[in-house]
Regions:
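Extracytoplasmic/secreted envelope proteins and their assembly/folding machinery
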Residues: 103-113, 138, 142, 159, ...
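Short, internal strand/loop/helix patches
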Residues: 142-188
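Conserved helix-turn-beta segment immediately C-terminal to the redox Cys motif
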Residues: 87-88, 105-128
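N-terminal targeting signals for export/organelle localization
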Residues: 1-66, 224-226
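Short active-site neighborhood of thiol/selenol oxidoreductases, capturing the structured segment around
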Residues: 79-105, 109
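Thiol-/selenol-based redox modules, centered on thioredoxin-like
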Residues: 179-226
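Short extracytoplasmic
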Residues: 51-87
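Thiol-based oxidoreductase modules, predominantly thioredoxin-like and allied folds used
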Residues: 121-136, 151-160
Length: 226
């Protein structure tokens, strides 16, 4: 008889149970290590300020408290500073007649938004603030932002209220007359990040890159202490 088979047959029930328990423990240990590795892989990578800047994100040394304001949401309802509470908001200033920068930015923001996991998307808002309130009425803004993503939101309102809000976020915009009698609007291309306390927290420089935005956004969220 083969020696190995003979040795196996000679093992007592207690020895066989011991071997089985050892195998089970080793398998469970391997599964635990694998689960820990996969969980770590899913965690955001914390990066330095220098890395943030190299990837297009500038985090304010101290988040800026915003003055109270009231704008008009694309739903037609009033929108106040309090609406930012409890959520992360990425705010871009643009307008529906913008020929290139705005649609490109909105499409990029949609690509970025789609890369986020479901839990992160749940408390992340993408908001377009109009710099052309004369033409961007709520219903028009509503259709425009939802063309890019049904979860996106739009804000418009009185010109001076929009201007004050933009100034607080260091986003310039100016009406520019055209030769044909019409006008366009020059505006900043950065995307501003407002934290769950409703404070100006950071901004993303143009040109935007969805992968870099995801990296920096997740790091900023992970280091936010409220």
């Amino acid at each position: 008889m083969d020696k190995t088979v003979a040795d196996t047959q000679q093992k007592t029930p207690e020895q066989q149970r011991g071997i089985l328990i050892t195998v089970v423990v080793l398998v469970l240990l391997m599964l635990a290590v694998l689960a820990g590795f996969l969980n770590k892989m899913g965690q955001p990578r914390i990066i330095t300020d220098a890395e943030l800047q190299a990837n297009g994100a500038i985090e304010l040394e101290r988040p800026r408290i915003l003055d109270s304001f009231t704008l008009l949401a694309d739903s037609g309802e009033d929108f106040s500073t309090d609406e930012f509470a409890g959520r992360w908001s990425l705010v871009f200033f643009g307008f529906t007649h913008c020929p290139d920068i705005c649609p490109t930015t909105m499409a990029t923001l949609n690509n970025f938004y789609q890369t986020l996991d479901e839990e992160t998307r749940a408390d992340t808002d993408i908001v377009l603030v109009s710099v052309d309130p004369k033409r961007d009425r709520p219903e028009k803004l509503h259709d425009y932002v939802r063309y890019f993503n049904p979860d996106f939101r739009g804000l418009t309102g009185e010109f001076l209220a929009l201007k004050r809000f933009a100034n607080q976020l260091n986003v310039p915009f100016n009406k520019v007359p055209l030769e044909d009698g019409g006008y366009t609007v020059d505006h900043g291309s950065q995307v501003v990040l407002i934290n769950p306390r409703g404070h100006y927290h950071a901004f993303f420089r143009a040109p935007l890159d969805p992968a870099k935005m995801k990296l920096t956004y997740r790091s900023i969220r992970a280091t936010y202490n409220g």
